[in-house]
Amino acid sequence: MGKKCQLTGKKANNAFAVSHSHRRTHKLQEANLQWKRVWWPQEKRWVKLRLSTKAIKTLEKKGLAAFAREAGINLNQV
């Protein structure tokens, strides 16, 4: 599994590290991903997901079923 949020699809961003003399070197800005066990009340079980911290905040607001439906994810396959 890659470094990608399973609900939002967030992934790394290609960027430049710019020095004081303005030399630019490529760098990767990784998404802030965390492994999170989320309770799925409809199935009465835990689901382990790799989520960005922004997705964790949204998950607390919307709930797992609504967020997964919105993202088009089948939680039975996770």
From Swiss-Prot:
<dbReference type="GO" id="GO:0003735">
    <property type="term" value="F:structural constituent of ribosome"/>
</dbReference>
<dbReference type="InterPro" id="IPR001383">
    <property type="entry name" value="Ribosomal_bL28_bact-type"/>
</dbReference>
<dbReference type="GO" id="GO:0006412">
    <property type="term" value="P:translation"/>
</dbReference>
<comment type="similarity">
    <text>Belongs to the bacterial ribosomal protein bL28 family.</text>
</comment>
<dbReference type="GO" id="GO:1990904">
    <property type="term" value="C:ribonucleoprotein complex"/>
</dbReference>
<protein>
    <recommendedName>
        <fullName>Large ribosomal subunit protein bL28</fullName>
    </recommendedName>
</protein>
<dbReference type="Pfam" id="PF00830">
    <property type="entry name" value="Ribosomal_L28"/>
</dbReference>
<keyword id="KW-0689">Ribosomal protein</keyword>
<keyword id="KW-0687">Ribonucleoprotein</keyword>
<dbReference type="InterPro" id="IPR026569">
    <property type="entry name" value="Ribosomal_bL28"/>
</dbReference>
<dbReference type="InterPro" id="IPR037147">
    <property type="entry name" value="Ribosomal_bL28_sf"/>
</dbReference>
<dbReference type="GO" id="GO:0005840">
    <property type="term" value="C:ribosome"/>
</dbReference>
<dbReference type="InterPro" id="IPR034704">
    <property type="entry name" value="Ribosomal_bL28/bL31-like_sf"/>
</dbReference>
